[in-house]
Amino acid sequence: MLNKKEQSELAEKFRCTFKDNSLYRLSPSSCMDESTLRMQLLWIQQTMEADNLRAAASMLAKRYSFVVVAALYSFIVFQKKINASTKNVSLHTEDAETMWLPKVFISETETKEVTEDNQKILLDELLDELFAHHIEPIWSSLHKVTKISKLTLWENVAVYIHWLYDLLLANEEIENVQVQKNLRYVLEEAEGHHFGSYHHNPLSRYSSPPPYVKKQKQEIRVRQTCCLSYQTGAEETYCQTCPVICKPKKGVIVHE
């Protein structure tokens, strides 16, 4: 079970909550129903001042990625596998704001202890729970409703997993070897079936080492697809890793 300290840490780092104080609840099952999903996307579009439903879909995918990094953080740092099933996790909005930063509501805090003997088995179980039976069905619905490419949606998740990777490697209290082993497995080595009906891991295409970007004067893992965040809000702003500003002349996929 997640103790109070661990719950507090997940709340601080990944906007997790363990109390239902929501004004607006977005459940996985509702995201898998196309008619309900369309209504939810219209609400997100209005709230975030998005230009279209495709941009709203990408923002939903980015917010949903916090479910993934919270579960992976618990697995690696606490050595506890949380229940990341569709029945135990949902996005809760506690106040209306343009940025729309919902919290990850985790209903039951029961966990499975990760040991050296069961680590591989439990990590595969977590990936099945997170991706094959949870994220992938939502991505499929988003694609059907808005025609957004799954390449964009999977890259949204990959970006946050790489962010978690960097966050953990910078923490001297955490064993780097274990971090690298687990996240390399998730990003590159895990078989495609853990993510849905895939022959290959859909995250692996986004795991190349970050190149040096002369324009930004630093190494940046430039996105292959645009997340469309510049199509939200009153001002047109771009992510630092945006392909539109980092490599605008190389056939970048903007409207996936």
What are these regions (language model features)?
Residues 250-256:
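Compact nucleic-acid interaction/catalytic patches
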Residues 48-217:
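Hydrophobic, aromatic-lined core segments that form the binding pocket/scaffold
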Residues 223-247:
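Local cysteine-cluster metal-coordination motifs and their immediate loop/turn environment
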Residues 1-59:
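Generic N-terminal leader/targeting and pre-domain segments
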Residues 78-79, 248-250:
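Secondary-structure boundary elements
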Residues 27, 68, 161, 231, ...:
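Generic short alpha-helical hydrophobic face used as a protein-protein interaction/packing hotspot
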Residues 26-34, 53, 145-149, 175, ...:
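General structural signal for secondary-structure boundaries
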